Amino acid sequence: ELSDSTVRMSDLDSQLGSSSVESVVETAVSAVKACIKKTGYLYADTHSTQPVKLDAYNGKKAEFIISGDKLFVKSFDDSNDTFSLFRHTVTNGVVSAAEMLDTSIKACNIIGADVWYRRSVTGSSLCDLYKYSTEKEKIDGDVASFAGLSDGSVLIVKNFVSSSDGEIADLYLYDGKKTSLVAEKAELKNMKYSDKGISFIRSGGDLCIYSKNKLAIIDGGAYNIIAY
């Protein structure tokens, strides 16, 4: 009898009357393979002689981010709607014990050397935005989304609403010290950003470019940005 299997010898015996020997053998082999198969999450790199088992996350939905010598783990809650964020340090293939950074997180990203994430707020569809370096720091509230830009600043999307023009929101920029308004009522479907700045169309058709802390209205009546 296989203690970790639902297949019993009596099941195989009863199949012999209606199935071929080959079919019964295949069922038995599959049951044995299922019992001895390695399951769960493993970490390995060029220093490891054997993969490191990450048993703490077994049986849960988890996603992993590797950044430098850090291993970040998003361990999802039962609803799969939010997750807890853990951080490990990896040294010569040895994975440190988990350090919990926060819970009830909706989304996260590594920007520079910091972890940025949106944390759900009870009773609200929006989130608080945090940055975690050596400790947790709240950057802003009522945040719908965010993105890191090539110059190290962070684009923050707030006051998100749906309209006849599509999804529109107010755009803010965090420069490492403060958050400043870029523009109100920007159409998110047409927004593009690069190392040159941010281009977008405001509700009503104004084509705008934000670059070097200045907002320029390029044209009116625009409905699509092909490239930027």
Describe each region flagged by the PLM.
Residues 49-55, 96-101, 135-140, 178-183, ...:
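A short beta-strand motif characteristic of beta-propeller blades
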Residues 1, 23-37, 41, 69-75, ...:
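Short beta-strand elements that form the blades of beta-propeller/WD-repeat-like
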Residues 66, 71, 85, 110, ...:
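Fold-core signature of tandem repeat domains
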Residues 46-48, 89-93, 132-135, 174-177, ...:
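Short loop/turn segments that connect beta-strands within beta-propeller blades
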Residues 1-59:
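N-terminal "mature head" segments of proteins
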Residues 20-27, 59-67, 103-112, 142-151, ...:
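Repeated scaffold domains used in trafficking and secretory/extracellular systems
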Residues 205-228:
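Hydrophilic extracytoplasmic domains
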Residues 38-43, 79-88, 123-130, 163-172, ...:
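Structural motif
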